[in-house]
């Protein structure tokens, strides 16, 4: 499973899971993963590892996109979040460790993208400036 940065406004710091052709979210009350989206008509790479062609904040709005190929290998699809977000963070691509983790994930060692900074729930309550966004108290 590969974590994706969430795009729902209420879940800004919770990562979703990309596992094979499904994006899921962990339901703490039910203690189970719930599917959010599937990539119908698409094929992933590397057999049992089932990797997308690319995963990362490629459009520059801090949320991660997934690039996959169609099952007939005639096109690429870029999947983006349809959910609006009130957060306006600087793109994760400005962070060198994050850029390097995209390269590592997609051309070599299969590990999820990682930023070079802490991105946790406490930030929202901090009232501090974070990557160009001012949190309220």
What name fits each language-model region?
Residues 57-59:
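Calcium-coordinating acidic loop motifs
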Residues 26, 76-80, 129-134:
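Hydrophobic alpha-helical transmembrane segments
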Residues 1-9, 13-16:
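Single conserved hydrophobic/aromatic residue that forms the stacking wall/gate
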Residues 62-63:
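Calcium-binding loop positions in Ca2+-binding modules
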Residues 15-20, 66-69:
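Hydrophobic beta-strand segments that make up the repeating blades of beta-propeller
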Residues 22-42, 83-86:
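Surface-exposed loop/turn elements that mediate protein-protein interactions on large endomembrane-trafficking
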Residues 6-10, 42-54, 96-136:
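Repeat-based blade/solenoid architectures
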Residues 21-24, 73-75:
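Loop/turn residues immediately N-terminal
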